[in-house]
Amino acid sequence: SIDAEGLFLRKRHLSVPDHLTWRSFKQGMLVCHQAFYARLDIARDIPYDLQYRHSADVDWCIRVMKETERKHLPLVRVPGVVADFMDGGNTTQNHRASLKERFTVMRRHYGLLTTLTMHVWFIVRSFFR
């Protein structure tokens, strides 16, 4: 992330795996939406679900990756930094609501048991950052 003057603050705590799939997002949002590029034909067919005020980006990325898998298309990792962003956006400002909504998104895509298990891991992982 960067500050208001564009100076580097820190890297994201999550990193993109070499082989990304929609299942990868069980670990958290591994690619920020600012750096997530989708083919236009797929992106046009998958609008943001506006019932989510804070986690529509997570849901959209997962649905795009599911569609990519369904069409047997590759997901390509671009090496290097493709987007810088400032801390303090919508998710940060609405942290509690964002966490609840992200749980709902994960439950929708991965099921309740997996989502609960991963959230226990998120809590444990937070102590080691």
List PLM regions with ranges.
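C-terminal, non-catalytic tails of nucleotide-sugar-dependent glycosyltransferases
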Residues: 7, 70-74, 97-129
